[in-house]
Amino acid sequence: MNLKKIVFGSTLLLTAALSSVSVQAADKIRFATEGAWAPFNFIDSNGKPQGFDVDIARALCAKMEADCEIVTQDWDGLIPGLKVRKFDAIIASMSITEDRLKVVDFTNKYYSGGLRFMGRVGDKFDLNNLEGKTIGAQRATLGAQYLEDNFTGKANLKFYDNQDNVYLDLVAGRLDIVLSDELPTYNWLKTSESGSKFEFKGEAFMKTDNIGIAVRKGDNKLKAKLNKALDEILADGIYQKINAKYFPFSIY
């Protein structure tokens, strides 16, 4: 029996085993985003998800030394998909609400926003006199809920599967006003071809709207890791660099 071969062979097996452990040690995390809420999440010309949400997810993954994948999912399918384990977390500019907290858990906020109306430049706007107006919003959002709670029976309400379709109907004249999160609307006004024809109407409200990363109910381990990584990118300036890439002011 050749002792050298035995020792060498054992060393190779040990090395392979350690390598396997090292590979397995990296957490595999699948994030879902919508891909239709620029500049927070959108699909680029190469078909890849990009945006503020995506950059934050990548920064968190780097801090956690995790093996991450970012996939897209229609808005209405995000929470159902999370619950059936299609993905591990949702980073899609999702507001932390009491209703959502009944079915998912959230990390600490990673930014805050508010709601704001938008309409054509020069059109008169009176929040207390919107009878007969056609107002649009994306379905299953805080904006849609606000309209249902306050304008059902008073104005014509239209809801859409994604924000891009809201903008399309506004430009086409099928909507008089839209209600949306202030920050993506700001981006649309600044960057779209039609943005110069429209303007904010009134001031922002519900500005305590905190946005978090959703995880499955009871997934405290992943929630804690994400919160720790978020604290780290806030402390070392990485968050601020990502913020500045998209907005000239802090959104935290």
Residue ranges with predicted function:
Residues S19-A25:
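Sec/Tat signal peptide C-region and signal peptidase I cleavage site
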Residues A26-S93, D236:
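Extracytoplasmic small-molecule ligand-binding "clamshell" domains
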Residues G35, Y111-R116, E182, K190-N227, ...:
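Periplasmic-binding protein-like
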Residues A62, V71-T72, D76-D88, V103-D105, ...:
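Short helices/loops that flank or line small-molecule/ion binding pockets
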Residues D67-D74, A137, A155-Q163, E203:
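Short beta-strand-to-loop elements that line the ligand-binding cleft
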Residues G77-P80, A92-K102, E148-D149, D176-K207:
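A ligand-binding cleft/hinge motif common to bilobed small-molecule-binding domains
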Residues G119-I135:
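Flexible hinge/capping segments at coil-to-helix
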Residues L142-Y160, S196-K201, L230-Y252:
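Ligand-binding clefts/hinges and TM-proximal coupling segments of bilobed small-molecule sensing domains
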